[in-house]
Amino acid sequence: MNFETQVNSSASRNSVARNNYEQKSRATSLSLPAHMSCSYQESELATDTQERSQLRYITANTDTEEQSFPVLQALNTHTEELNLDVLLQRADHLRMNEFSKMESFELLWDHKEKFRDEIEFIWRFARAYGDMYEISTNTQEKKHYANIGKTLGEKAITRAPMNGHCHLWYAVLCGYVSEFEGLQNKINYGHQFKEHLDKAIELLPEEPFLYYLKGRYCYAVSRLTWIEKKMAATLFGKIPSSTTQEALQNFLKVEDLCPGFSKINYMFLAKCSMDLKQTEDAVKFCDLAMLLPSVTREDKDAEDEVKKISSTLKR
């Protein structure tokens, strides 16, 4: 059973409409990444990737870790001291650009000793480890980033149980950690994911990203095998249940709150509509998906899936 949330760049990065939404909702303190300009050149991306790949790894031990994990060493040896508000604003701003997430992580890393007890810093640092999980292509590194981020997330929700951002990113990181676990632990993390996602929605009811995640959860649960449902019932006393219709409603909620949220949200809208035999809607969502630029690998994967759906619908 795959409970991974797939909180990748294509899920939380959006179109021009998403940029407008973020400007309106900046006061929520949750800065989700936005689409880059379509004029960003492939050569620039390649150069940036090559430079990043040359970074040295160091080993760090923090009070949130029980073992050593590799983390990226900052590119700049000189660290500019920032106050908390300026630091958070700068980290959020960097993260809005898909190709500056690593720089945002480095900035937070450089200030972790100074602000390690500040809640607004902690949940962002946990989120940044989730970003590094997405950026890394090495399985062991991804596992390390997921585990550190989850530990930071636990610290955040313990200290600020009424902060929706803490619950959001803890849920996300539970999804990432679950990718390296067996079936029983996957089910356990899926349960935690749902629990904290629901709490985040209660605290942040207007945040579209949460409904995207809820849609993904519902879609995955609707496709559980009998043995997976049986094991979940054994662990938690009840069988998890959801439907494609419920998944569709959550993806539609995303579109209602922020039209053009992401290519992958349109892809799932098309998937759900096709499964429910709502052919006209499926075609519409495929067309809308193709109008959005494909910036990241996940965008390209979503576009490939949309093309397959379109081909199926034309038969």
Q: Which positions does each model-derived feature cover?
A:
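Extreme N-terminal leader/anchor segments
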Residues: 1-120, 279, 283-293, 303-315
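Short coil/linker segments at helix-helix boundaries
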Residues: 89-90, 94-103, 127-162, 168-206, ...
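Boundary/linker segments of alpha-helical solenoid repeat arrays
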Residues: 119-120, 164-165, 208-209, 244, ...
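Short N-terminal amphipathic alpha-helices
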Residues: 118-124, 137
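C-terminal transmembrane module of eukaryotic multi-pass membrane proteins
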Residues: 258-278, 282-286, 292
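"A position-specific structural signal for the A-helix of alpha-solenoid helical repeats
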Residues: 82-90, 124, 128-131, 169, ...
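Structural helix-adjacent loops and short alpha-helical linkers that scaffold large soluble proteins
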Residues: 140, 278-280, 297
